[in-house]
Amino acid sequence: MASEDEVSEFLGQNPETAAWLERVRGQCESDKLWRYRREFILRNLSDVCGEGEIPPPPETNHKELDRLLAYSMVWANHVFTGCRYPIQVIEKVLKMAENIKVTDAPTHTTRDELVAKVKKRGNSSSNEGVEELPRKKKKSNDHGARESSYIDDTVEIRNQPGDARERSSGKICDGYIPSTSLNKREAHSRTDVNTEFYEESGNGRPLPVSKAKSSLNPPEEAGYKHAATQGRKSHSDSRYQTAVKGPSQSSDNALKPTRRFTTEHTKERQPFFNRLYKTVAWKLVSAGGFNANLNHEELLNTSIESLKATLEIAFVPLKDLADFPQNKTSQENTVCELRCKSVYLGMGCGKTMDTAKAVAFREAVKLFLKKKVVVRICRRKFNGRDVEDLVLVDEEFRPPNLPPAVKNPHELV
C-alpha cells in the first residue's frame, strides 16, 4: 500500500474491510485527512486482527482495535493540525507510520516559537489599532500647567507604528489600552490622575468643572457630557472635592467602605487561569498563531467553556465613565469589559457594542501570548475613587494606568 492506487485496489478486493473502514471514519473528517489515516489503519490492522482477517464491528469494544484507531487519530492530529502529545506517544505513532509518505502536510508554529516571534516584534503588535490621545495647545501659563497635568495623567501609547501615530494627531482611539499593555511609569504617579480634569467649551478652551457642568446642560442636541471627576477647592489647604457623577453613579456607592482583597483571593483563582493559559495557547498553535483573521471571541469563549466556567461581559456607554478620557468625538462610544471568575481580563472601546467587544477579546487573547499569566491585586478607578481589583497580568507586569472599572469589583466577588 505504497500509494493511493494500491490502497484502492486492496479495498476493491476486500469489500468487508472497506465497509468496516467507512464505519470508523469521523463525521467531519476531510477526504485528505481520512485518506492518510485510512492508510495508517490498514498498515497496522494485521498486527491487531491477523493477516487477511476481517476486523470485528466497532461496537464490540475490541481493546487492541480501539487503541489502533486512537493512535491513528493521534498521528493525523499531530501531522495535519500540529497537536502535541507526550514524547512516548509521538515516537510510537511515528514508528507505526514510518512507511507512509505525506507530501502535503502543513507546517505548524509551536507555542515557544510563537512567543519568541512576538517578543522579537516587541510591543508594536500589542498596541495595534490603538491611536494616541491628542494633545491640546496651551492657551496660557495657567492653562498650560493644567494641560500638562491632564496629558501626564492620560494613558500613553508606546511603541506605536508610524502610520498609527500620524492618524492619532486629530482623533481619539476607538480601542483603549488594556490592562495587559506595559507602561513603565511609576505606580505612585497614578494617585494624581484625577486632581485636575477640564471639559471643553464651544471655542475649544478648557473650562473648570463647575463651568463645564453648566455649559453642557442643554441635552440631546449635542449629547450631554458628564462633568469631570474632580475640581480644585478654593481653600488654602488645596484639598480636592468629590467628583461630579453621572446618573448611573449614585452618592450611596461613593459612601460605601472599600473592602480589601487578600492573597487568598488570588491563590484561589490562579490554578484555573493556569489551565486556561494552556488551553488558549494550544488553540493558538492549532490556529496557526495570533493574527488579525483569528476569531478571538470564539477562541476565548470555547477555552473558558471547556473548563466549565463562564465569561462575564459588561457594556456601558463611554459617557457614563467619568474616569475615562473623553472628547467630543467619543461621546457615543461604548466600553466593553471582560471578566472571568471576577478577574479582569481586558477592555475595549468602540462606536458599536460589537466593535468594543471585538477589541476587548483581541486584547484579552494577546495576554496569553506571554510565558505566564498571574492573578494580582491592582488599583483601579471606580466612581472617581481608587479601589482594589483582581486583574490577570503577565509575569513581567509593571503597574500601568489601568482603565477605570465598569462595575464595583468588590460587588462581583
Curated annotation (Swiss-Prot):
Pfam families: XTBD (PF11952). Residues 21-118 form the XRN2-binding (XTBD) domain. It comes from the Eukaryota. Residues 183-193 have a biased composition (Basic and acidic residues). Residues 118-266 are annotated as: Disordered. It is found in: Nucleus, Nucleoplasm. InterPro entries: XTBD. Keywords: Nucleus. Its main location: nucleus. Belongs to the CARF family. This is Protein CDKN2AIP homolog B. The lineage of its organism: Eukaryota, Metazoa, Chordata, Craniata, Vertebrata.
